[in-house]
C-alpha cells in the first residue's frame, strides 16, 4: 500500500512510541511553514563594527535632534572596569561614555537622553554636538546666596496706630482713667482680640510704607529656590530659607499728645530689600535647565497673639507706662504656622541670570502656589527600568539622597566664615541613618531643611583646624512641603550662628568612616513601580506609582513593542515577579488604574524576555511561555522531553559528510529546560519567526509563529541586539548579523531525520519497497539524498538503504516495526520539501516462509 507522509516540525514529546508519522527528530537549517520544510538562509553581516569577546550591545539609541538623525549602538565592555561605549551603526570606532565605573543594571532612552539605571542611582547621557554628555542627580546641586539691602545696621523704623478714646478703652476688660487725661491711662487685661486689632492696625501702617516699593520686605518671610527643567518641573531645591527683618517685640501704648488727642500704639522694626544669587555646581546640566523659580510666603510677624496683663509702671510717678513685651511662637506652633503658609511663585529667572544677584519681590497671594509633587530631589536606583507609554518605569527601586554636599543657603553674615569639613548624620524615624561628608562654612543658616521624609534629627560633626565639634538639629516633618525643617529662634531674631559643642577626634573619625561607605538609601520597595512624568526621565509623580502586592518585581514588558508608546488596552504592561506575572492596565490619563495577577509562571531568565507583534515570550521552568492578553501557552511543550542526537545512528558521520553537515550541529544533547537557562531570543518581524539560541550550544532553535512548529539552525550567535524591527544579533566573530536576509541566493545545506514512523501499522512488522521525497525543488543531484533506518524496539537501529536522489527503490529484506527517514542536500531559498510517498507492505502471515 502507498502511504503519504507530510513532514512536520521538530518534536521531542510525546515519546518515540507515541509520536505521529512525519514529526522530525532532527531538523537542520529547516523550518516547517505552509505545510513544507523551508530552508533557513544564513544571516547577513551588517555594519563595520567588530566587538571583542566581552563586549555586548545593550541598546540601540536612535532619534533626531534639530534635523540631525542619529542611530548608535550602546556597548558594554564586561571586562575590566565595565566601560561603556557608543558607536554609529555604520561606523566602527568606539567612543567612551564616561560613567565613572558606575554599575548599570539596564539601559533605556527617551528622546536624546540615555538613562543608565543602577542600584546606587541613575546616570544620564545627553546626546548633543556629536557626543554624549553624562550627568547624574547630584549634578543639579546649586548654591544659593542671599544679600540684604540696606545693610544690617539700618536704623529701626517706628510704625504707629492711633485710636479715639472710646474706641481704645473698649479693647480692655477693665480699665480706669486718671483724673488728669494728660497723665495717662491705667489699663487692665489686654484681650487677644484687642491685641490682634492693634497689630493689624500697625501692620496697615507698615503696608502703607511697603506700597511705595514692592521690593521691601517686613517681618519674617520663608522661601525656597527651585531649579527648573525644560518642561517646567523642578529637580532640585535650595532648601528652606528665611528673610529675616528685625522686629522689636515691645508694643508701646502712648499717651495723648498735642498732635493727637487720644491714645496710640507703636512697634519698631526694620524693612529690607533682598537679592538672591544662584550658581550651578557644574555646567553638565545647562542644556536641561531653563532657569530657576523663587517661591515665598506672605510675611508674618510670628508673634504670639494672646491675652497680656497690664504693662509696666513708672516707679517714680506710679503711673502706667503701658508697655507690653510680646512673645514669639516657637516649637510645634511655629512649625504648624510654617506648614499653613502657602508658598507663591514671585519670580522666574532664566539661564542668563545664573551667577547674578536678582531682586526679590513680595508675594501678594494671588500667584501660582507651590505643589509638593513639583519637586523631585531624590535620586532613584533600581534593579531595572523600562520605557513604555513615553514614561520611564523603575521597579525594585531605592530612593537615594544623592546630594552629599548639602545645599546650604548662605547669608551676608556667613561671607566671612571659614570653610570647614562637616559630617552630617541624618537619622530617620525608621531607624535608618544617612551619612554625608561635605565642606561648608562654619556658620549654619537659620533654617535648615532637607528633602527627606520622616527625618528626626541630624548630628553635625565639624572639624576646624585641630578642633572637633558636634551639634544636633531636631526636625519637623512638614505635612505640606516635601521637607524636614529645623528652625532656630531666640527672642525676635533667628540664629545665624550655632554654638557647637566640643567633641573628641575618635567620634569624628568613626562618623567619617561610616560616611565614606554610606549607600544614602532613604527608602526602598521591591513590589512597586515608579512611573515618570511623560517625556521626562527625572520626575516621578507620586500618583503614577503602582504596586503588585508583596511580590518582588524582576522585569517589565509591554504587550506590543512596536506600538507600545501611547497605547491603551486591556493589558498594556506585564510585571514579572517572583510569584508570577501581573497585568497592569491604564486609564485615559496614562495612570495605572488596576492590577491583577495573570498566571503563576515565574520568569527564569529576565534578560531573555522578547516582545513580538501581539505577544510577550519569556522562559519559565516549564519552557517558553507566550503571553497574549490574558491568555498564555507554553510553545516548547513539543520539545519538552529527551532530545535526539543523530550522531548515535549507524553511519551518521559518513552520511553527514556527504552534505558537509557538521556533526555537532545535529547533536541535540541538552534538555530544553536546561537550554533555556542561558538562552536569548531574537524576533524576525518580517518572517514572523523566533530564534532561540544558547551561546554555549552549537545549535539554535527557530520557531514559526505562522505554523507553530520548530526547527533548528547552526548557532553562530553570542548575544542579541534589541533594535526593532531588525532581527539583529552578534555572531561569534563579533560581527552584527541580520537574521532576515531576503537577498540570499546561495544554496542552503540542510538535513533532517524523522522520528520513528509506524506507517499506520503500529506493532506490525512491515517492509518498505520504495520511497519518494516530494517537494518544490529542482531534481538535481545532491538536492535530496535519502537514508532509511529501521528498528524493532526503537533503540537499536540499522541502516536499510541509501540513495543520492529523492528516489529510493529496490528495497527488500527483513521486515521491521519502525522506520526513520533521513534526508540531506541543499535548497535554494524558494525551494522546499513537503513530504514523502512510501510503498509499504505489512508482513504476510499466510504465506510460506
Q: Across the structure, where does each feature detected by a protein language model lie?
A:
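Surface-exposed loop/turn elements that mediate protein-protein interactions on large endomembrane-trafficking
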Residues: 83-94, 124-136, 408-410, 521-545, ...
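Conserved loop/turn at the beginning of each blade in beta-propeller domains
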Residues: 52-53, 100, 378, 549-552, ...
Amino acid at each position: 500500500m502507498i502511504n503519504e507522509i507530510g513532514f512536520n516540525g521538530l518534536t521531542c514529546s510525546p515519546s518515540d512510541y507515541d509520536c505521529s508519522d512525519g514529526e522530525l527528530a532532527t531538523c537542520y537549517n529547516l523550518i516547517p511553514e505552509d505545510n513544507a520544510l523551508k530552508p533557513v538562509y544564513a544571516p547577513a553581516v551588517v555594519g563595520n563594527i567588530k566587538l571583542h569577546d566581552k563586549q555586548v550591545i545593550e541598546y540601540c539609541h536612535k532619534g533626531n535632534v534639530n534635523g540631525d538623525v542619529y542611530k548608535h549602538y550602546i556597548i558594554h565592555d564586561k571586562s575590566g572596569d565595565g566601560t561603556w561605549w557608543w558607536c554609529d551603526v555604520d561606523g566602527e570606532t568606539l567612543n567612551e561614555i564616561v560613567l565613572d565605573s558606575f554599575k548599570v543594571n539596564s539601559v533605556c532612552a527617551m528622546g536624546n537622553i540615555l538613562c543608565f539605571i543602577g542600584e546606587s542611582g541613575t546616570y544620564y547621557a545627553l546626546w548633543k554636538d556629536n557626543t554624549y554628555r553624562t550627568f547624574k542627580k547630584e549634578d543639579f546641586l546649586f548654591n544659593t546666596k542671599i544679600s540684604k539691602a540696606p545693610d544690617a545696621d539700618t536704623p529701626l523704623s517706628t510704625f504707629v496706630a492711633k485710636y479715639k478714646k472710646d474706641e481704645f478703652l473698649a479693647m480692655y476688660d477693665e480699665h480706669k482713667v486718671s483724673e488728669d487725661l494728660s497723665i495717662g491711662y491705667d489699663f487692665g487685661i489686654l484681650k487677644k482680640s484687642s491685641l490682634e486689632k492693634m497689630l493689624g492696625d500697625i501692620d496697615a501702617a507698615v503696608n502703607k510704607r511697603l506700597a511705595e516699593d514692592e521690593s521691601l520686605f517686613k517681618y519674617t518671610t520663608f522661601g525656597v529656590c527651585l531649579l527648573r527643567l525644560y518642561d517646567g518641573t523642578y529637580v532640585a531645591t535650595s532648601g528652606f530659607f528665611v528673610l529675616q527683618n528685625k522686629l522689636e517685640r515691645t508694643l508701646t501704648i502712648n499717651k495723648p499728645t498735642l498732635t493727637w488727642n487720644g491714645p496710640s500704639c507703636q512697634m519698631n522694626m526694620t524693612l529690607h530689600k533682598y537679592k538672591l544669587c544662584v550658581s550651578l555646581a557644574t555646567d553638565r546640566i545647562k542644556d536641561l535647565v531653563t532657569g530657576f523659580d523663587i517661591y515665598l510666603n506672605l510675611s508674618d510677624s510670628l508673634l504670639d497673639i494672646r491675652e497680656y496683663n497690664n504693662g509696666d509702671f513708672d516707679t517714680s510717678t506710679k503711673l502706667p507706662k503701658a508697655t507690653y513685651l510680646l512673645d514669639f511662637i516657637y516649637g510645634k506652633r511655629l512649625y504648624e504656622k510654617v506648614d499653613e503658609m502657602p508658598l507663591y511663585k514671585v519670580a522666574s529667572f532664566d539661564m542668563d541670570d545664573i551667577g547674578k544677584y536678582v531682586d526679590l519681590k513680595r508675594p501678594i497671594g494671588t500667584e501660582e502656589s507651590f505643589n509638593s509633587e513639583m519637586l523631585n530631589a531624590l535620586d532613584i536606583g533600581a534593579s531595572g527600568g523600562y520605557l513604555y507609554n513615553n514614561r520611564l518605569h523603575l521597579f525594585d527601586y531605592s530612593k537615594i539622597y544623592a546630594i552629599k554636599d548639602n545645599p546650604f543657603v548662605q547669608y551676608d553674615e556667613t561671607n566671612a566664615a571659614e570653610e570647614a569639613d562637616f559630617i552630617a548624620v541624618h537619622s530617620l524615624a525608621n531607624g535608618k541613618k544617612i551619612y554625608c561628608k561635605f565642606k561648608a562654612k562654619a556658620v549654619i543658616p537659620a533654617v535648615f531643611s532637607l528633602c527627606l521624609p520622616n527625618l528626626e534629627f541630624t548630628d553635625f560633626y565639624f572639624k576646624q583646624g585641630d578642633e572637633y565639634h558636634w551639634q544636633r538639629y531636631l526636625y519637623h516633618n512638614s505635612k505640606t512641603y516635601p521637607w524636614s525643617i529645623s528652625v532656630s529662634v531666640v527672642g525676635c531674631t533667628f540664629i545665624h550662628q550655632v554654638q557647637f559643642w566640643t567633641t573628641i577626634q575618635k567620634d569624628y573619625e568613626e562618623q567619617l568612616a561610616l560616611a565614606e561607605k554610606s549607600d544614602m538609601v532613604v527608602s526602598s520597595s521591591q513590589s512597586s513601580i515608579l512611573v515618570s512624568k511623560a517625556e521626562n526621565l527625572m520626575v516621578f509623580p507620586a500618583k503614577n506609582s503602582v504596586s503588585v502586592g508583596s511580590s518582588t518585581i524582576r522585569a517589565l514588558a509591554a504587550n506590543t513593542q512596536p506600538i507600545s508608546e501611547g497605547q491603551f488596552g486591556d493589558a498594556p504592561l506585564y510585571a514579572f515577579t517572583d510569584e508570577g506575572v501581573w497585568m497592569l492596565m491604564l486609564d485615559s490619563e496614562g495612570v495605572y488604574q488596576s492590577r491583577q495577577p495573570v498566571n503563576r509562571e515565574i520568569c527564569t531568565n529576565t534578560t531573555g524576555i522578547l516582545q513580538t507583534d501581539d505577544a510577550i515570550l519569556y522562559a519559565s521552568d516549564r519552557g517558553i511561555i507566550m503571553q497574549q492578553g490574558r491568555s498564555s501557552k507554553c510553545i516548547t511543550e513539543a520539545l519538552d522531553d529527551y532530545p535526539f542526537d543523530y550522531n548515535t545512528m549507524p553511519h551518521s558521520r559518513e552520511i553527514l559528510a556527504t552534505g558537509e553537515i557538521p556533526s555537532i550541529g545535529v547533536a541535540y544533547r541538552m534538555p530544553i529546560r536546561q537550554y533555556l537557562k542561558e538562552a536569548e531570543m531574537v524576533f524576525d518581524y518580517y518572517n514572523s519567526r523566533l530564534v532561540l539560541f544558547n551561546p554555549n550550544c552549537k545549535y539554535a532553535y527557530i520557531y514559526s509563529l505562522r505554523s507553530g512548529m520548530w526547527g533548528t539552525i547552526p548557532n553562530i550567535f553570542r548575544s542579541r541586539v534589541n533594535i526593532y524591527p531588525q532581527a539583529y544579533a552578534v555572531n561569534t566573530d563579533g560581527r552584527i548579523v541580520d537574521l532576515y536576509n531576503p537577498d540570499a541566493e546561495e544554496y542552503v545545506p540542510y538535513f533532517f531525520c524523522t522520528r520513528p514512523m509506524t506507517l499506520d501499522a503500529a506493532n506490525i512488522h512491515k517492509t518498505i519497497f520504495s520511497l519518494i521525497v516530494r517537494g518544490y525543488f529542482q531534481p538535481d543531484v545532491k538536492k535530496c539524498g535519502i537514508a532509511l533506518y529501521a528498528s524493532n524496539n526503537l533503540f537499536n537501529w540499522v541502516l536499510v538503504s541509501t540513495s543520492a536522489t529523492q528516489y529510493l527503490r529496490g528495497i527488500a529484506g527483513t521486515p521491521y516495526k519502525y522506520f526513520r527517514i533521513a534526508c540531506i542536500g541543499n535548497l535554494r531559498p524558494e525551494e522546499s520539501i513537503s513530504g514523502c510517498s512510501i510503498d509499504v507492505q505489512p508482513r504476510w502471515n499466510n504465506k510460506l516462509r
